[in-house]
């Protein structure tokens, strides 16, 4: 079997295609969430705490020197990334809950006791007397 044929069989399998679609949609969803956080969520929060732009929040660790930029601890960008993560985590958790609820089969009614179980129950009840 040629390598090209093996690869084609591998790539066409359902799991690989599903995973590829998931990765592409996940990347697009991540961009949407990043835009939501940086363009919609963070500006009002920054405005509420005194007109702060979170992108610019940083602490200078070492000043700029000739030929080198200042070393900055950009904690504002980190805060935005935390918001990104939380929104994505909540969305994924919600989707997993819905999918699990759909996949979960309706619980079957308890099975009728077998003849042996009925007999053992009668014996137990007689011994209790």
Swiss-Prot record:
InterPro entries hit by this protein: Mechanosensitive_channel_CS, MS_channel, MSC/AndL, MscL_channel
Compartments reported by the entry: Cell inner membrane
Superkingdom as given in the UniProt entry: Bacteria
Any one GO cellular component localisation term in the record: plasma membrane
Record membrane topology: Multi-pass membrane protein
Pfam family, one: MscL
MF annotations from Gene Ontology: mechanosensitive monoatomic ion channel activity
Chain segments annotated as transmembrane: 10-30, 76-96
Keywords of this entry: Cell inner membrane, Cell membrane, Ion channel, Ion transport, Membrane, Transmembrane, Transmembrane helix, Transport
Gene3D superfamilies named among the record's database cross-references: Large-conductance mechanosensitive channel, MscL, domain 1
Function, as annotated: Channel that opens in response to stretch forces in the membrane lipid bilayer. May participate in the regulation of osmotic pressure changes within the cell.
Similarity comment: family membership: Belongs to the MscL family.
Description of how the protein assembles with itself and partners: Homopentamer.
Protein name: Large-conductance mechanosensitive channel
Protein species of origin: Actinobacillus pleuropneumoniae serotype 5b (strain L20)
